[in-house]
């Protein structure tokens, strides 16, 4: 109703499943989905791909969280080899994961903002991607 009244231009959804998105699409065009997703929490892998096929933006929340100590050490090793920070590598992985991923990382200072922006310039080579893709599900257990 709000969209029909001109009060809302576009509809985005958060914390939704494929089924819920399909249900919403029967009523309105969906332009963006925001769910938890990052280099180690990839439960939405198939959803990211589906949305990319449909031209729908995906905004991951918690893009830098959830690392175990083992994952963190492996992530840091990749970062060190690239002359980057671990967080830059994690953001770069998301940006390289799919063209429909849009990042809104938090920042606490101008220096932090510059570090976040530098992640967009970081190109992860195949060997780094291979290492990073093994982080999912790895823990100390």
Report each predicted region and the residues it spans.
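Beta/alpha (TIM)-barrel catalytic core signal, keyed to glycine-rich beta->alpha loops juxtaposed to Asp/Glu
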Residues: 1-141
């Amino acid at each position: 109703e709000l969209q029909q009244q001109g009060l809302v231009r576009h509809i985005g959804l958060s914390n939704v499943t494929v089924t819920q998105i399909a249900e919403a699409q029967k009523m309105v065009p969906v332009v963006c989905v925001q769910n938890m997703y990052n280099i180690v929490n990839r439960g939405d892998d198939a959803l990211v791909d589906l949305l990319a096929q449909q031209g729908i933006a995906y905004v991951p929340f918690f893009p830098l969280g959830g690392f175990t100590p083992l994952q963190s050490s492996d992530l840091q090793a990749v970062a060190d080899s690239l002359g980057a920070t671990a967080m830059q590598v994690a953001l770069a992985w998301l940006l390289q994961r799919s063209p429909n991923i849009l990042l809104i990382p938090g920042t606490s200072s101008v220096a932090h903002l510059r570090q976040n922006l530098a992640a967009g310039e970081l190109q992860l080579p195949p060997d780094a991607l291979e290492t990073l893709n093994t982080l999912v599900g790895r823990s100390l257990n």
